[in-house]
Every structure is written in C-alpha cells, then in structure tokens.
Amino acid sequence: YQSCCGTTLCFGCICAVYDTGGPSGGLCPFCRTPAITSHEEFVERNKKRAEGGDAGATFQLGRLYSRGRRGLPQDYGKAIELWLRAGELGSASANQNIGACYYNGQGVERDDRKARCYDELAAMRGTVKARHNLGLFEYTAGNTERAVKHWMVGAGAGFDNSLDGVRRHSFEEGLATKDDFEKALRSHKEASDEMKSDQRDACAAANF
C-alpha cells in the first residue's frame, strides 16, 4: 500500500520495480512522491489520508495496530475501531477482518453470528476469502449444498481453498457431483490464468 497516493501494488509490480533498481530516484512509481524514510512518516501519511476519509488508509492503519507494526503497539481494539470506520467508507477487507476478529475472539468476545454477518457483508462487496468462510459456516451447520455454492463462487474467482473445499469436503465425500468439481476446476483455472503475468511468475520464482 502506497501511503502517498493510496495505490496498492501487487507482488508482481513490487518485484518489477525493485528488479529495475528500485523506485526511480526513490519516488513512488505512480504519483512520483519521494519514498518514505521512516516508520513514523509511513504512519503519519496514513493518518493524514485516513483523516480525509480514505478507506484504504484507514484499513491499513487498522492492520498496523492489529499486528503491532511500524512502531505502533498491538491493539486489536484500536484496529477494530479503524476497520469499522473503513467499513463505513466501503472497505470490504475491513469487514472481513472484523469478522475474523469475532471468529477468533481477538479484541472482542468470540461470536460466530457476528463473524458470519461481517463475512456476508464482505462477500457481497466482493471479498473472496469471506465468501469461502461462508461456505465453512454452512458446511459446519450441515448445509452442504449451500457450502458448495459458496465454494464454487470462490473457486471461480481463483481462490485455492474454495477449490479444495469443493474437492475435499464435497466431491470426495460424495456431497457434490463430478460435474460440480469439473466446473469448479475449469473456472478456477480460468481465473488463475487471468491473474498470471511474467512479473508475478518471476516474483514467485524468487520467493519474494
């Protein structure tokens, strides 16, 4: 996440930038702002963008507090507060992270119902991991048909765990048809192929 302009770089782009000797002149490859030189500067840039209503920056601040990174103390309560704000601003990832906190009891009392509610919101906003989690909730509740539907969506978006869910929890247990699995396999491959690039392949090969 580029705290200067709010742009998010994939690992392939990051590798491409550093493969050419790093950002030209120490500048952001997108907005040309000078690169940060300290944790304090990174945090301050994020805070400034968050104060201006930037959902991405607000989400990133929450991540920093949840992990105790960039000189900030680990504080799940503060992280959730920021993610709630980011969710109001439209961040699906913030919704999903709050759901994870409720599921794991991090910073809040464990509550599967609330965890599911936040995963549902995140899934409706397009977060594939949250969609996969809904499949797990349904499978645990014995609603295998619904679980498979969620995992089919996740597999179609290229999410490996969802494809494994269709295979391991459904097809191999006789709870899904061969056609279901083959359809999931095809859609997963199509999505994965669309996301491929020479830069991402090089990044993976370098174990970046």
For each of these PLM feature ranges, what is it?
Residues 76, 112, 144, 178-181:
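TPR-repeat structural position
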